[in-house]
Regions:
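Redox-cofactor binding/interface segments in oxidoreductases and associated redox assembly factors
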Residues: 40, 63, 90
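Catalytic cores of nucleic-acid endonucleases
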Residues: 69-113
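Long, low-complexity, serine/threonine/proline-rich intrinsically disordered regulatory regions
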Residues: 3-5
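Residue-level detector of flexible, active-site-proximal loop/helix-junction positions
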Residues: 45, 68, 117
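Non-catalytic C-terminal interaction segments of nucleic acid-processing enzymes
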Residues: 109-208
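Active-site ExK catalytic segment of metal-dependent nucleases
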Residues: 60-67
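Active-site metal-binding core of divalent-cation-utilizing nuclease and nuclease-like domains
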Residues: 7-9, 13-56, 60, 171
Length: 208
């Protein structure tokens, strides 16, 4: 499915804003990819990803450039997205569709969002390729310490309770094959409960 129109309430002029795009975009992605989890406003280095889509074995960055946005920060955002995510998409309003390829790397996917009379039409203009700049040592930093602990337990690794988080990350990277670790990271992000994380972190501190 490359193109699909979704019907949502939005502003009546022809300009698409970020707030108009998000909800129908996420539904479109869920229909396209199947089982996914969408995490909004994810801190990504010194930038903030508009959204991150977690699949069974990949984490995909999503940057939204609505008709009201400019390219002013995009170069810097691209750098940080490419540090952390397996693939990346930029989603653009029609005002950007003609020139967006000039502003993102060739491996980035491009989705256009166009306002129709009865909804928003999404079209996958370019499929995302595997990000050649991705680094597992950066991707693993997306996880919190309790999530690393669960990965250690499932893979029968020492607890390293007295060691720093960076040391634990390095041991996991050294001991777990990369293909398996992609799935482990996705599993933790799928199960992440933001309402419980403070309690989990406090419980971990008390166990040390």
């Amino acid at each position: 499915m490359n193109a699909h129109t979704l019907r949502f309430a939005y502003n009546k002029d022809m300009t698409l804003y970020d707030r108009d795009i998000r909800e129908p975009l996420f539904q479109w992605l869920e229909e396209k990819y199947g089982m996914v989890r969408i995490i909004e406003e994810k801190q990504t280095g010194k930038a903030r990803a508009d959204a991150v889509m977690v699949t069974v074995d990949e984490v995909i960055g999503i940057e939204i450039k609505s008709d009201a946005d400019t390219y002013a920060r995009l170069e810097n955002q691209v750098k940080y997205y490419d540090w952390y995510y397996d693939r990346n998409y930029v989603v653009v309003g029609t005002s950007h569709a003609l020139h967006i390829e000039e502003h993102v790397p060739a491996w980035w996917g491009i989705i256009t969002a166009e306002k129709e009379a009865d909804g928003i039409d999404f079209y996958e203009m370019r499929k995302p390729q595997v990000n050649p700049k991705r680094k597992m040592k950066r991707k693993i930093t997306l996880l919190w310490r309790p999530e690393l602990v669960r990965i250690q337990k499932r893979n029968h690794l020492p607890a390293y309770k007295e060691k720093a988080k960076k040391f634990v990350q390095e041991r996991i990277l050294a001991k777990i094959p990369e293909e398996q670790l992609h799935r482990e990271i996705s599993r933790e992000l799928f199960e992440r409960d933001y309402t419980l994380i403070e309690a989990e972190l406090e419980e971990y501190r008390q166990r040390k």
